[in-house]
């Protein structure tokens, strides 16, 4: 397994605990019976994998057991792993768009790790050899980060119209031939109508001023908020088209099951996971490795 998965096992977070619980349940059984199924179901639900997702995992597992005539509990683990990997794997859409120019809108509620994610994403794009510019309405943190990392930050004063910031950032990115423009957005979900109008306006500005640019809209969700992250995915998904999810704060949480739920319930690929505070701690989401982490591989 790669570095990111060892990060999880070091932390003994969600992965270690769920892995232990699953193997305890399976190893305690001499045969594959209804009691084993009930215990597995309970284990998944208590690991913050939602009820609906758990039901679809269990349904798939029962079919798999029947079709493959599985009678040994040890083989149940492999079947379970395949089913869970299938749920979170969205194929090619898992990758960040590699085209240039690219405009990335980053949305999510304040405090969920949005600003940090933007900084880490900019760092990642630069490491991949792409030129980067940031557009931010007020984030002082981003300005400091940009100065440290030699990335241009186009900003307006606190409370400025985000669309005006996007407009200026686009003009600057076009003039400099920048590969990737990453734009922050306001993080208020309280007033959905305002948020919707704001995002629509930003999208209209990009459509009009930068029609040749490829687009990504990334939703940042804090894994430690558990079920709240699911409702945020729903709310933001109703407001705008989301091309991918960034799941942050996965290093110290027992709530990692939320990744499985979000990937299953919404047709949105998880593109990145945040596994620490460091600049390198934004990892591409690799379904096999992520689920492998649960099964301690």
Language-model region placement:
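Short glycine-rich anion-binding loops that position phosphate/pyrophosphate groups of nucleotides
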Residues: 186-188
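Exposed alpha-helical structural elements
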Residues: 10, 21, 75, 289-290
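Generic N-terminal initiation segments characterized by hydrophobic and/or small/turn-forming residues
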Residues: 2-5, 33, 248
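Primarily NTPase-proximal linker/entry elements flanking Walker-type ATP/GTP-binding cores
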Residues: 16-174, 178-183
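Conserved catalytic-core segment of NTP-binding enzymes
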Residues: 141, 162-176, 190-296
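N-terminal accessory targeting/assembly segments
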Residues: 1-20
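Residue-level signal for pocket-adjacent positions within structured domains
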Residues: 2-3, 21, 27, 91, ...
């Amino acid at each position: 397994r790669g570095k990111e998965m060892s990060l999880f096992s070091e932390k003994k977070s969600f992965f270690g605990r769920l892995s232990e619980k699953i193997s305890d349940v399976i190893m305690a059984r001499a045969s594959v019976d209804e009691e084993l199924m009930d215990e597995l179901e309970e284990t998944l639900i208590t690991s913050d994998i939602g009820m609906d997702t758990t039901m679809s995992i269990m349904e798939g597992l029962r079919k798999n057991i029947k079709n493959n005539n599985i009678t040994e509990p040890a083989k149940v683990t492999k079947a379970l792993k395949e089913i869970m990997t299938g749920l979170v794997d969205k194929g090619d859409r898992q990758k960040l768009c590699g085209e240039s120019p690219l405009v990335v809108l980053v949305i999510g509620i304040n405090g969920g790790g949005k600003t940090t994610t933007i900084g880490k994403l900019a760092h990642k794009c630069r490491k991949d050899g792409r030129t980067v510019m940031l557009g931010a309405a007020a984030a002082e943190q981003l300005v400091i980060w940009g100065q440290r990392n030699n990335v241009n930050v186009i900003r307006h004063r606190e409370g400025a119209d985000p669309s005006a910031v996007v407009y200026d950032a686009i003009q600057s990115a076009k003039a400099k031939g920048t590969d990737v423009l990453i734009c922050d957005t306001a993080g208020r979900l309280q007033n959905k109508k305002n948020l919707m109008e704001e995002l629509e306006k930003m999208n209209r500005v990009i459509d009009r001023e930068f029609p040749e640019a490829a687009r990504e809209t990334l939703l940042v969700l804090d894994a430690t908020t558990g079920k709240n992250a699911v409702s945020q995915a729903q709310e933001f998904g109703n407001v705008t088209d989301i091309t991918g999810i960034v799941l942050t704060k996965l290093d110290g949480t027992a709530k990692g099951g939320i990744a499985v739920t979000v990937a299953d319930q919404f047709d949105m690929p998880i593109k990145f996971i945040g596994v620490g505070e460091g600049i390198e701690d934004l990892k591409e989401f690799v379904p096999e490795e992520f689920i492998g982490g649960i099964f301690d591989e």
